[in-house]
């Protein structure tokens, strides 16, 4: 057992694998579904205890009532455990999907001609299928060219455009391989300048639903420009929801051309490697993943690595060694959070997937180069000019960093406690990658649940305003919070702990 509270956060996508086939709120109160309800609650409790701090709801699938069921279960369990859990709404966004196929799908053979209907909506048959998008107004005919590739189902089917029939709104292609496609599978048009609207009416309805359920994050699909972020921020401002944090999903070459601006305009970045790896050459994805992690650290923003991290665990118990290495080095490079998608949404072993990711994350943290972090990231971070950084963050990083020759040794501190509602202070403590977990004492419910993505940050809800605490009150509450997270982190022997009181570092 590695005895420290895991500081890298885990985002788990919630779907039927976790909350079973509970589709309506009424089902939660129906005795006929009592066993299913008990299993769903037990699953969510298991993953939260194993380090999940964010539940992601993918609004490309399911309706509002299904998502309301999941939110209720998560909130009930989080309250029972007295742990903060963030809710992330992942927008449908400007994506193109197969409209509808028969249950057995549509089998496409290599070298066959395939017709894509871009405006009519018909069930797929005879090598023809229709496409749809959330806006309902998009016409793919306007975005493709003869000779261009169209990738379907995460690239499992490759089509090449043979001709374009603008009169009948059809794209005629030649299949490059055999594959069976199914309803709602994604289409990608590599290097296309998509004319599809960034925010559809469906996206806005989904966001409105999320706001009524007090979501903490919006993961915005296919952000390509800073204007996309501004559009979303303006909408949130109009709904009195500026506190909701925006995570820009980077999924296209267009976005990479504007990446620094997008990072600065957003609250964080999701390296969405699935679609990104279809929109750009796959061998460039690791470079851009590394670049985005470094840039987010520099600009004091959050960064999430996502997609196929433990993909084999959808069907298997053991991860591949390549997957283990992938997760390990995402943490080692400075990620805030690692994400599970299909593994927990639809996989056969969702609880195991979370446990595996937890153990890899914790192992990587023991080898994290805290001295390099001090000498490079902290010396160059945009946050370094603040007084709080100079008086508190840098001294804490220096004090808690373990001695290192080849590997880390001499971890002396388990926790740092700070009482604050100041987001800039919380972000600075997270970005510093301290060699100790940071407990934030807060009386603000939005601060309490709003930091599930932030590396090393563990809020604890108190009644008093942080700035009103006396030193004795601060120490008393800090020790209560430490005991709470010591138990959650399965830390049998507590090491030293530090506090930040009126910007001075004190022993606890």
UniProtKB/Swiss-Prot annotation:
Binding positions (Mg(2+)): 251, 275
Cysteine-cysteine disulfides: none
GO molecular function: ATP binding; kinase activity; magnesium ion binding; potassium ion binding; pyruvate kinase activity
EC main group: transferase
Co-factor(s): Mg(2+); K(+)
Site keyed Transition state stabilizer: positions: 249
Binding site for K(+): 58, 60, 90-91
Residues noted as binding ATP in the record, renumbered to the chain: 58-61, 97, 185
Any one of the GO BP annotations: plasminogen activation
InterPro entries xref list: Pyr_Knase (IPR001697), Pyrv/PenolPyrv_kinase-like_dom (IPR015813), Pyrv_kinase-like_dom_sf (IPR040442), Pyrv_Knase-like_insert_dom_sf (IPR011037), Pyrv_Knase_AS (IPR018209), Pyrv_Knase_brl (IPR015793), Pyrv_Knase_C_sf (IPR036918), Pyrv_Knase_insert_dom_sf (IPR015806)
Cellular component GO terms held in the UniProt record: membrane
List of residues binding substrate: 56, 274-275, 307
Organism domain of life: Bacteria
Keywords assigned: Allosteric enzyme, ATP-binding, Glycolysis, Kinase, Magnesium, Metal-binding, Nucleotide-binding, Potassium, Pyruvate, Transferase
Activity regulation summary: Regulated by phosphoenolpyruvate substrate and is allosterically activated by ribose-5-phosphate, AMP and other nucleoside monophosphates but not by fructose-1,6-bisphosphate.
EC number: 2.7.1.40
Catalysis: reaction(s): pyruvate + ATP = phosphoenolpyruvate + ADP + H(+)
Pathway the protein contributes to: Carbohydrate degradation; glycolysis; pyruvate from D-glyceraldehyde 3-phosphate: step 5/5
Subunit structure and binding partners: Homotetramer.
Family listed: Belongs to the pyruvate kinase family.
UniProt-listed NCBIfam families: PRK05826.1, pyruv_kin
Listed name of the protein: Pyruvate kinase
GN (gene name): pyk
